[in-house]
């Protein structure tokens, strides 16, 4: 039976937390998010913040993005970005290393929406079908994105039409990810 995005995201997040617990005996930590307020913050120490996911609060959709571009977004993207506040998480899928993007706080959710709008405006200007980024790669020009039309997860090169299928759905993509402890 197929999982929904919410269940798949919670499952991946728990696998990521479990990996950190196995490696360090602690919850996940981030130096990049040190000093940035968040409901996820459970402790700060040695210039890093330890975090655990927290329920998302506020308007649980990306309606601002839809209104700005007069577009209807795929339901999976709403579900992905409005399930939880959490830190970004490293993962592998096949030969690809990803950083799964997450919303850290209410302010971060506003920034995310602005970035999604910018991404979609660029695609519209280049006459590309719309995608919504969910994960970055080691290359600044390559990302994992949800195709807004098909719901497929694709590896795409920013600003080009080059896209490679990663998974048939976002839930399948999340299920297939293997959490990675940061190096």
Swiss-Prot record:
It is found in: Cell inner membrane. Pfam families: Syd (PF07348). It comes from the Bacteria. CDD domains: Syd (cd16323). It is a peripheral membrane protein. GO terms for cellular component: cytoplasmic side of plasma membrane. The keyword Cell division does not apply. Signal peptide: none annotated. The keyword Cell membrane applies. Transmembrane segments: none annotated. InterPro entries: Syd (IPR009948), Syd_sf (IPR038228). Keywords: Cell inner membrane, Cell membrane, Membrane. Belongs to the Syd family. Interacts with the SecY protein in vivo. May bind preferentially to an uncomplexed state of SecY, thus functioning either as a chelating agent for excess SecY in the cell or as a regulatory factor that negatively controls the translocase function. This is Protein Syd. The lineage of its organism: Bacteria, Pseudomonadati, Pseudomonadota, Gammaproteobacteria, Enterobacterales.
